UniProtKB/Swiss-Prot annotation:
Similarity comment: Belongs to the CheB family.
GO molecular function: phosphorelay response regulator activity; protein-glutamate methylesterase activity; protein-glutamine glutaminase activity
Active site residues according to the UniProt entry: 184, 211, 311
PTM statement from Swiss-Prot or TrEMBL: Phosphorylated by CheA. Phosphorylation of the N-terminal regulatory domain activates the methylesterase activity.
The protein's name in its UniProt record: Protein-glutamate methylesterase/protein-glutamine glutaminase 2
Xref: SMART domains: REC
Function: Involved in chemotaxis. Part of a chemotaxis signal transduction system that modulates chemotaxis in response to various stimuli. Catalyzes the demethylation of specific methylglutamate residues introduced into the chemoreceptors (methyl-accepting chemotaxis proteins or MCP) by CheR. Also mediates the irreversible deamidation of specific glutamine residues to glutamic acid.
Source organism: Methanosarcina mazei (strain ATCC BAA-159 / DSM 3647 / Goe1 / Go1 / JCM 11833 / OCM 88)
SUPFAM superfamilies: CheY-like, Methylesterase CheB, C-terminal domain
GO biological process: one example: chemotaxis
One CC-aspect GO term: cytoplasm
Residue ranges constituting the CheB-type methylesterase domain according to the UniProt record: 172-367
Keyword line: Chemotaxis, Cytoplasm, Hydrolase, Phosphoprotein
Positions of modified residues (4-aspartylphosphate): 66
């Protein structure tokens, strides 16, 4: 096959299979991945049925899978892969509400991460994303598939005493605590489990930075809102901080909190910006963490969940300096132990907890 690099396949490299019905996307992704000395494209497939045959035959280390295809669509293909040949899968997704919803469902079904399929001049925009694409493939090749259990019907797992009818017009009170959360690869699944475990009356505002392409965070917010006792929304410029509400940074925007006080009165609000990426990410966990450390000091509880690289560690240092608490997800429940691992390596964690123990500990702290 013309897109393969036989010489590299003989070495200790990550063996990638690309499944996409677009010949252009297959070629562009192949060109990008084959330029990375640690990755070799061992095959391509034109639809899900073809992809399953190639997975059976080639046994790749990572599959890049289009979410919308003829013959056998991405979700059905993913389900077969995870049931028959568990393999780290990265969803290659188009924009649009339908595609974004399918992608989030795929993440629930066992996909590890998502990359955006650009619109417009495909080849040019794809090559601009080359570094991110290669980094994700390298990271997901190390994913712990034991922690990719599906989180379906999560609403039924929420204790009855945690549920209440949501009220978008909550009584405005000063924010007593701030829970700041950072996540990357594996994060959407972890967030569903964590946010769905909080009681409605938790005395804290919740701020989340999840590394995702633009558009997907809006769909993620709606999905979490439907499965949580808390109100969950994609953050907007000027949103007023309030307890019992979860604010998710929109894709491609940094999220900070600013204090608007005049003569001692005013409210803390969300500020969004398109400033430079930090550690290759926008939104950045570090940007959020530094912001809440400055304003809330010892009232901050920060969580660093599953994810690649080390975003959040520098910000966690600032939170510690200001008297706040830092919680890192234990490796036993992480899909990728990059971000929380860096917290532990720097000795910044007050607690190191598996995902299913976090909510109870946080409720104890804030109450």
């Amino acid at each position: 096959m013309s897109n393969q690099h036989p010489k590299k396949v003989l070495e200790m490299v990550i063996r990638a299979l690309i499944v996409d019905d677009s010949a252009l996307i297959r070629k562009v992704l192949s060109d990008i991945l084959n330029q990375d000395p640690k990755i070799a494209v061992i095959g391509t497939a034109i639809n899900g049925e073809d992809g399953l045959e190639k997975v059976r035959k080639l046994k790749p280390d990572v599959v890049l899978l289009d979410n919308i295809m003829p013959v056998l669509d991405g979700l059905k293909t993913l389900s077969h892969i995870m049931e028959e040949f568990p393999t780290p899968v990265v969803i290659v997704s188009a924009l649009g509400e339908k595609a974004e919803e399918i992608t989030l469902t795929a993440l629930e079904y066992g996909a590890v991460d998502v990359i955006e399929k650009p619109s417009g001049i495909l080849s040019q925009s794809m090559h601009e994303m080359a570094e991110e694409i290669c980094a994700k493939v390298r990271a997901v090749s190390k994913a712990d598939l034991n922690n990719l259990g599906c989180i379906r019907d999560l609403e039924h797992q929420i204790p009855e005493n945690h549920r209440k009818k949501k009220n978008s017009l909550r009584e405005k009170t000063s924010v007593r605590n701030v829970l700041a959360i950072g996540a990357s690869t594996g994060g959407p699944r972890a967030l569903e489990k964590l946010i769905g475990s909080f009681p409605a009356e938790i005395p804290a505002a919740v701020l989340i930075v999840q590394h995702m392409p633009p558009g997907f965070t809006a769909s993620l917010s709606k999905r979490l809102d439907a499965k949580s006792a808390l109100r969950v929304k994609e953050a907007q410029e000027g949103d007023i901080m309030e307890e019992g509400t979860v604010f998710i940074a929109p894709g491609d925007y940094h999220m900070e909190i600013v204090r608007n006080k005049v003569n001692g009165f005013g409210e803390d609000t969300v500020h969004l910006s398109c400033g430079p990426k930090e550690l290759g990410s926008r939104p950045s966990v570090n940007v959020l963490f530094r912001s809440v450390a400055r304003i809330y000091g010892p009232r901050v509880i920060s969580l660093v969940l599953t994810g690649m690289n080390c975003d959040g560690a520098d910000g966690a240092e600032e939170i510690k300096k200001m008297g706040g608490k830092v919680i890192a997800e234990d490796q036993s429940s992480c899909v990728i132990y990059g971000m929380p691992g860096e917290i532990v390596r720097r000795n910044l964690a007050d607690f190191v907890l598996p995902l299913d123990k976090m909510a109870d500990e946080i409720v104890k702290i804030v109450r």
